[in-house]
């Protein structure tokens, strides 16, 4: 099943999700409407809400609560992006100016806060203490991940284990929430809930690993942001760490300096050459494929359906993309 088939299968549900997102963004405060609509209409893969609606359908559930789950997960993600771009001082996302570049840092932070709190209002509508607890824990872990990544910036001593922990906190945990909350709403068994939770964790990890590879291998137009941003921001991601640890003394020193100083986009060609020599992008991509396969294996216990097949295909497609 290709992405077009998955989109066709989920079109009606995702249309409801998009309508819900726009409705829940509505506020009497004009700036919230302007900035909120700016960011949600800027595109994006909507993969987290897609996971939620597919997971619910895979367990035979098709009620409004699945749409609410999908919406609150996307709101947490959107709020984190607003805050991320301020912290990273990013000026381009999804092929256009970031919200902070367009509206300023203060507005981005405050509207991000509004969207976070709106997500909690949506969870309250579900009347599930378990989902509330899962969401509260996830947002706390996400915040910890943001702080840990901030600490890792310009630090070439960052370990691969530390990097993977940040990936889990910042990305995979929210994928987990999308799949697990859908399973709870659908009334799935404990085994099915755990299976979907694992699916989300592995898929989220694979997804972020591929994003980190694409930062060095995609073109800016396809990627929707500047290539080499991670290097320019001094972020030690897996491809960079692998190249540094496998390069000779001179190569390791060059990468170490690039991480420590940041802002050295002019070093990108040399870094890419070192990565190519040591197959660092291949290494990171292989790790991503392993995680995607774990995601597929995790949901084999789900009943056979076109929605289960869509989840399986989504895992494979997440590591076979150029944006």
Stretches found by the model and what they are:
Residues 1-323:
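All-alpha prenyltransferase/terpene-synthase fold signal
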């Amino acid at each position: 099943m290709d992405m077009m088939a998955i989109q066709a299968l989920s079109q009606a549900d995702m249309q409801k999700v998009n309508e819900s997102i726009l409705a829940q963004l509505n506020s009497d405060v004009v700036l919230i409407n302007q900035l909120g609509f700016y960011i949600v209409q800027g595109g994006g893969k909507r993969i987290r809400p897609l996971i939620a609606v597919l997971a619910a359908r895979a367990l035979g559930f098709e009620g409004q609560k699945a749409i609410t789950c999908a919406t609150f997960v996307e709101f947490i993600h959107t709020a984190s992006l607003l805050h991320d771009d301020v912290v990273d001082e990013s000026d381009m996302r999804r092929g256009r100016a970031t919200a902070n570049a367009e509206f300023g840092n203060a507005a981005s932070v405050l509207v991000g806060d509004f969207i976070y709190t709106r997500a909690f209002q949506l969870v309250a509508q579900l009347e599930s203490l378990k989902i509330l607890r899962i969401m509260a824990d996830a947002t706390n872990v996400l915040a910890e991940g943001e702080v840990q990544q901030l600490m890792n910036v310009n630090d070439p001593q960052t370990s691969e284990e530390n990097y993977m922990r940040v990936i889990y906190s910042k990305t995979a945990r929210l994928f987990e929430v999308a799949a697990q909350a859908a399973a709870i709403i659908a009334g799935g068994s404990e085994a099915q809930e755990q299976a979907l939770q694992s699916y989300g964790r592995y898929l989220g990890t694979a997804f972020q690993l591929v994003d980190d590879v694409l930062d060095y291998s995609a073109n800016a137009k396809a990627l929707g942001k500047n290539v080499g941003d991670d290097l320019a921001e001094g972020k030690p991601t897996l491809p960079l760490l692998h190249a540094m640890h496998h390069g000779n003394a001179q190569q390791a020193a060059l990468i170490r300096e690039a991480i420590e100083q940041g802002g050295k986009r002019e070093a990108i060609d040399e870094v890419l050459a070192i990565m190519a020599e040591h197959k660092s992008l291949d290494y990171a991509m292989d790790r991503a494929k392993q995680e995607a396969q774990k995601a597929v294996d995790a949901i084999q216990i789900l009943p056979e359906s076109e929605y289960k097949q869509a989840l399986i295909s989504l895992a494979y497609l997440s590591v076979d993309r150029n944006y």
